[in-house]
Amino acid sequence: MADITRLKGELRTEFGKGASRRLRRDFRVPAVVYGNDLDPMHVHVDILEFQAILRNEGVNAVLELEIEGQDHLVMIKAVDQNVLTLDVDHADLLNVKRGEKVEVDVPVIFTGQAAPGALVTQEADVITILADVLNIPEEITVDVEGKEIGDQVLAGDLQMPGNASLVSEEDTLIINVVEPEEEELPETDEEGEGAEGEAAEAAEGESAEGESEE
């Protein structure tokens, strides 16, 4: 695994919604550190540094969090984001140990092209696995190259990276290859078109008669 990202935090001295809002105005993210017999610690970290970690490493990122001169190995377990700005409002940080295995949700993506005339639908975007805390995969890839209509990929068919193991049910449907539904084309109203044509012809005939009378 690459070098572990370091992040410095500070213990919170004020609590409540008002205190959290003041922290966010000062570009700090309120967070709680818990797990492995550690008494929960309420801290705050720099919002720009934390959001950069999320962008580059995602949720499940593992980092060294320094609090009052002491390092804690933590994993980003969950984040609450503002629905409008997408800024992080709060974070849950799980205290972990080297060599420990943790349950994490990992995205599943597919690559390749199915057989001509077949449509690939993805039924599950994430699966839960058990992985070494320092070797959590960013994603799991499924190759659908050449798959035919009726083919399926279940969670149990996925290749687990490294020493990771599947936690999700093995029969969880991940990929389903189906026949595309034909688009319904609007029906031509032949009777209506005929009536319109007759009306147009009648109008032309009346116009011609009027000109001849003149």
Curated annotation (Swiss-Prot):
InterPro entries: Rbsml_bL25/Gln-tRNA_synth_N, Ribosomal_bL25/Gln-tRNA_synth, Ribosomal_bL25_b-dom, Ribosomal_bL25_C, Ribosomal_bL25_long, Ribosomal_L25_dom, Ribosomal_uL5_bac-type
Region spans: Disordered: 178-214
Biased composition (Acidic residues): 179-214
Gene name per UniProt: rplY
Purpose: This is one of the proteins that binds to the 5S RNA in the ribosome where it forms part of the central protuberance.
The UniProt record lists the keyword Plastid: no
Full protein name: Large ribosomal subunit protein bL25
A GO CC term attached to the entry: cytosolic large ribosomal subunit
Assembly description: Part of the 50S ribosomal subunit; part of the 5S rRNA/L5/L18/L25 subcomplex. Contacts the 5S rRNA. Binds to the 5S rRNA independently of L5 and L18.
Leader sequence segment: none
GO biological process: translation
Family of the protein in this entry: Belongs to the bacterial ribosomal protein bL25 family. CTC subfamily.
CDD domains: Ribosomal_L25_TL5_CTC
Key words, A-Z: Ribonucleoprotein, Ribosomal protein, RNA-binding, rRNA-binding
Species for this entry: Corynebacterium jeikeium (strain K411)
SUPFAM superfamilies (alphabetical): Ribosomal protein L25-like (SSF50715)
UniProt key word Nucleus: no
GO MF terms held by the record: 5S rRNA binding; structural constituent of ribosome
Cited Pfam families: Ribosomal_L25p (PF01386), Ribosomal_TL5_C (PF14693)
